[in-house]
Amino acid sequence: MTTPAGSGTGYGSVSWWGLSPALDLQAESPPVDPDSQSKTERKVPELDALLLGSVDGRHMLRTLARAALWPLRSFNFYVLENNLEAVARHMLIFSLALEEPEKMGLQERSETFLELWGNALLRPSVAAFLRAQASHLANLVLEPDRLEEQLPWLSLRLLKFRERDALEAVFRFWSGGEKGPEVFPMSRLWDSRLRHYLGSRYDARRGVADWDLRMKLHDRGAQVIHIQEFRRWRDTGVAFELRDLSAYHVPNRTLASGRLLSHRGERVAARGYWGDIATGPFMAFGIEADDQSLLRTRNGQPVKTASEITQHNVTELFREVAAWRGPRAIQGNVEETESPEPDVPAQEPFTIHFLPLDSSQTLHHKTCYQGRFQLLYVSCGMVHLLSPELGACVAPGGNLVVELARYLVDLRPKELKAFSDRVVEIARVAGFAPHTATKPSETFARFYKLGDSTPGGGDSAVESGPAPSKVESTRAPLPESISPPQANQAPSLEAMSPPLADLAPPLETMCPPQANQAPPLEALSPSKADQIPPLEAMSPPQAKLVLPVEAISLPQADLASPPEVISPLQEAMATSWVNAPPKHVT
């Protein structure tokens, strides 16, 4: 229910972009063990990383871009999201980032990426590219052989069949299977979310944006975000204005997701925008840079905006990835690379494996995952999934990186501290210990695995796979002590860490609060019953079952009850809302 002070839920219930800078995962993982490497001299060492809620692939892109500064290594990224729309965006982003230069130039690729990734509205040319690419991906999803041939870096074999069907439906919706802007009226949906979030402060929304930027984001390290670009994004959803603002008028369908609502006593599926409307997509690539000249200030003001820094960083990222993939493509082992067969395509030096949406608590049952991963990354919205069972999948001495809620404007310092303490407690229970010698970071917390705490034995018949990797030392070296061997390397982006709660849309966004109770936050950990496939996959028999968000008057008193599982981030945000003093913005 909207209160005079607003709902206090600008974070959203599903994440589309990272709320912290990108990380080089090699710098965060333990170094290659020389003993184990000598035993397999002819094999290229591998990095197995498990990422929960990475959302936009920024950490993987950053890792690939920096790979040329490290010894030769191949990568196996295992990605777990809580909604299939996020999986589809991963596929779209990487297919764009790895597009052949002959088909699309570097500048065009970077501009297209920024609009698809962070803008609510698109230019017609970018919308046409989205339709064509989505149609192509929809045809590949259901044909594993063609998918492996055309996108050898992608593996969907671990997804369930119904998830692949739903994924294909997402791409069909993106490709324009349902015509007309009324199918997804983004501008109206954005304004509806904004009104619900601000309440009576809606008419003073420019003042609210100024306060959130100057008194919160700037104080927390994001000084390069300019007030004009932040206001524009808060008002229209357009974060990156690469052309005249009037050129952006086509809804970005990649930001659409479905959720179950209760309408007149019946549970119905509604498509809408349930993402972030408070912080913005500036944190992932826009507040840090290898080129320190981009962060200079003049008369106390940054000379570059977050949008300009983001465009520069993304362009350099794509350039470095393209340069690394060419000469360093791996052909299985060193000997084979010298004389590959002419008809056999070169093996990609990395593979992205997408895991089933509900597999976080069952991975340890499969022996191929027990003690396999040298690195586990968890976003702030997925912290509740960190458990001893998940910790059993990390090799002894492996590292854990947890994103903190530093850039969530709805949380006050007191709630941020409580959330950080809760993260430490959850990590200890899962079998990890903090890196006490590391420099404290407000962006994310770092831990290492204590010994081998595999809970029970796994069933080797469940799934076969390569033997899990082991890290020799009980305590992994600190991330700050790990750096590429080159002397001329650019400074690493320590602050660039992954946030974003990419969790399936909950039902509480519009739930009215009780008299003495804060309104439930948009669930970061929705119950299984509320996790629905994309609307196209549901094929409802009656048109009345699929309603736009405006068809359901906001807020509704008969919305479905909130899920029982409450994540630590949700608790912190609820506390923030309860203790919030009345806000008066003039």
Curated annotation (Swiss-Prot):
**Superkingdom per UniProt:** Eukaryota
Main localization is: cytoplasm
Q: What are the annotated GO cellular component locations?
A: dynein axonemal particle; extracellular region
- State its location(s): Cytoplasm; Dynein axonemal particle
Q: Report residue spans for region: Disordered.
A: 455-493
Q: Name one GO biological process term.
A: brain development
Annotated Pfam families: DUF4470 (PF14737), DUF4471 (PF14740)
Sorted UniProt keywords? Cilium biogenesis/degradation, Cytoplasm
UniProt family annotation? Belongs to the DNAAF3 family.
**So what does this one do?**
Required for the assembly of axonemal inner and outer dynein arms. Involved in preassembly of dyneins into complexes before their transport into cilia.
What is this protein's name?
Dynein axonemal assembly factor 3
Originating species:
Mus musculus (Mouse)
